[in-house]
């Protein structure tokens, strides 16, 4: 009764036949892939707070996103929730996670995947080549060690896009949330061996994100330092288009030294300010442990674009994003590529990483209060609604400053906690029902009308939706869990077809009209031709960064597009010399549009970004 699968897809029966039906994670005595909590960005109120966790959350704020296949998207997610089995503090400080802060803990009793929402997802140990599926998270966790997967394994095709050394290594783990990819490669950072080390060191008891591979074999690579003060941390990224980024990191000691130099300069200047901050203590080290995990003090200071294949001789003279931190290593401020501060944060002096206030550029500050257990009890917004949160057994009461009250009733624990009844401010009640994996199977609205969702036993995909009137819409899927048909209550049917790479090649409407899609590039998901039901064809041409360069309609007229290095559209050229030109300020805001005759529209913005 060790929690290993009783019967998995691809296993052999006594008769020598393969098991091709059933879940990949049917366990004896233990669940698999269950998270310690619900997703922080799931149900939120106010600005925002997750009432099921009692946590202040910021589900995701993007600081950098240049276009391209497998782009490097740098985002930050915050949650004041603290898991009992945390990964180390990430590069944005306690409470924050970057996409590359994903970590896998390898323990004797199991595997713990720490996601970029600050949660812990628990899996049973995996044998080499084994794949486990979390029904509640719709996530696969795999271990390398085999050249190919059995043909009955839904991930067998996606497995083959991985580099051979990754597939064959039993020390590499992989995760994905889609049969079309991408794969997240969880390996360990290389390090320079010590002078007294004769043999290569054993892999550590954890894995970190070292790369991403999509269904076309394109890669996003995270380069980690092999030695020095920031050993093991991400110092560079190469995206799927070949761009290279440098991540400038600092240690707590380096930030403390910089602070002391700045303070000395300020105090020695006759006109220098004499503020309370001049005497602020900035320690050289941080406490080794926090409620958010162990902390090595390494922080991301700035991100630079160091190489762009489309602009090999031009590089930005300023970072694309910049960050500053408090003396306690907490993220204080975020600056965009123009050097403008766009975000600011304040934390509880007694609880490292507990956010008590934040604001956007030009906006008022939202403040938060917590109870003794670390749950948010109040949000105060000087120019909006305030909210109070009261926590009871299996219920949460949310009241705003207009005295409107909602009550959430919950069932389940941890990652399977769900809201099963909601009392709205107007007195109405809605209800929801879930299966044992936490997947929605029925909803009843305030008028008592019930909608039911039929789910596939293994995948959880919705196979039918039955409305309050008893009419049913049915959905069909292929082996890659892509929708292939929709059958409506009147008997009419629409359908979709895909190629071996999962790209849409044809879709037929309820009326029987078919639209077809063609692809010139076998390593791209972008269509180059669209043929409608009349036989008319449209053609598209794309840049290496996935931007539309030219569109030719069914009449043969072509529209061409131009972009700057940041992916912003700067010109549109239509037939007969009709062109439009756009320009942007350093913050990336549209400030001018001009036509071929010189007529111009100009735009201005407030500090908050309002037009």
Residue ranges and their predicted role:
Residues 1-49, 221, 311, 315-323, ...:
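Intrinsically disordered, low-complexity proline/glycine-rich segments
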Residues 14-17, 62-63, 291-292:
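A generic local secondary-structure boundary/capping motif
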Residues 24, 62, 184-187:
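Hydrophobic/aromatic beta-strand elements that line small-molecule binding cavities or substrate pockets
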Residues 30-83:
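Intrinsically disordered, low-complexity segments enriched in small residues
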Residues 56-61, 97-99, 105-109:
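Short alpha-helical segments and helix-capping/turn motifs at coil-helix boundaries
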Residues 63-68, 72-78, 93, 97-101, ...:
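Short, conserved DNA-binding cores of transcription-related domains
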Residues 83-97:
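Short, polar loop/linker segments at the starts of domains and inter-domain junctions
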Residues 92-94, 109-611:
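Extended charged/polar low-complexity repeat regions
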């Amino acid at each position: 009764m060790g929690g290993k699968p009783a019967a998995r897809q691809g296993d052999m029966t006594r008769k020598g036949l393969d098991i091709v039906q059933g879940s990949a994670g049917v366990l004896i005595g233990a669940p698999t892939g269950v998270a310690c909590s619900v997703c922080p960005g799931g149900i939120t109120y106010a600005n925002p707070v997750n009432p099921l966790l009692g946590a202040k959350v910021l589900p995701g704020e993007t600081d950098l996103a240049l276009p391209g296949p497998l782009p490097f998207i740098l985002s930050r997610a915050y949650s004041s929730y603290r898991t009992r089995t945390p990964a180390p503090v990430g590069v944005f400080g306690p409470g924050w996670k970057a996409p590359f802060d994903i970590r896998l803990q390898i323990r004797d009793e199991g595997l713990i995947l720490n996601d970029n929402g600050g949660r812990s997802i628990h899996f049973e140990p995996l044998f080499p080549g084994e794949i486990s599926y979390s029904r509640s998270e719709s996530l696969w966790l795999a271990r390398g060690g085999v050249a190919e997967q059995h043909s009955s394994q839904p991930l067998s095709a996606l497995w083959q896009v991985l580099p051979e050394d990754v597939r064959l290594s039993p020390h590499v783990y992989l995760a994905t949330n889609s049969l079309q990819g991408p794969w997240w490669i969880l390996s360990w950072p290389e390090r320079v061996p010590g002078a007294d080390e004769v043999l290569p060191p054993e892999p550590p008891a954890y894995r970190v994100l070292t790369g991403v591979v999509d269904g076309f074999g394109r890669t996003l690579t995270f380069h980690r330092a092999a030695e020095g003060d920031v050993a093991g941390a991400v110092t560079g990224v190469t995206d799927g288009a070949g761009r290279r980024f440098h991540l400038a990191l600092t240690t707590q000691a380096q930030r403390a030294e910089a602070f002391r130099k700045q303070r000395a300069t300020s105090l020695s200047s006759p006109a220098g300010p004499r503020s309370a901050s001049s005497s602020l203590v900035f320690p050289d080290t941080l406490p080794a442990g926090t409620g958010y995990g162990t902390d090595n003090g390494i922080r991301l200071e700035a991100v630079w674009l160091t190489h762009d294949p489309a602009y090999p001789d031009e590089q930005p003279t300023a970072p694309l994003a910049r960050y500053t931190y408090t003396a306690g290593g907490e993220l204080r401020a975020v600056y965009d590529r123009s050097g403008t501060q766009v975000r600011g944060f304040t934390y509880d002096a007694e609880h490292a990483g507990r956010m008590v206030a934040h604001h956007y550029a030009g906006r008022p500050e939202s403040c938060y209060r917590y109870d003794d257990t670390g749950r948010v009890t109040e949000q105060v917004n000087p120019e909006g609604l305030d909210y109070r949160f009261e926590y009871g057994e299996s219920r949460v009461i949310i009241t705003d400053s207009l005295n409107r009250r909602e009550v959430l009733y919950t069932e389940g624990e941890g990652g399977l906690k769900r809201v099963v009844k909601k009392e709205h401010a107007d007195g109405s009640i809605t209800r929801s029902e879930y299966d044992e994996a936490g997947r929605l199977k029925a909803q009843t609205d305030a008028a008592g009308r019930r909608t039911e969702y039929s789910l596939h036993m293994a995948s959880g995909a919705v196979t039918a939706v039955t409305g309050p009137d008893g009419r049913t819409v049915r959905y069909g899927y292929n082996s890659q869990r892509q929708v292939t048909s929709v059958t409506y209550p009147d008997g009419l049917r629409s359908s979709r077809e895909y190629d071996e790479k999962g790209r849409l090649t044809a879709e037929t409407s309820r009326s029987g009209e078919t639209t077809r899609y063609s692809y010139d590039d076998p390593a791209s998901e972008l269509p180059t031709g669209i043929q409608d039901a009349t036989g008319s064809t449209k053609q598209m041409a794309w840049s290496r960064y996935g931007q539309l360069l030219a569109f030719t309609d069914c009449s043969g007229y072509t529209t061409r597009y131009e972009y700057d290095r940041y992916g912003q559209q700067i010109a549109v050229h239509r037939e007969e010399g009709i062109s439009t030109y756009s320009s942007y300020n350093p913050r990336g805001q549209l400030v001018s549009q001009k036509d071929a005759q010189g007529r111009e529209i100009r735009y201005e913005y407030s500090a908050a970004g309002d037009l």
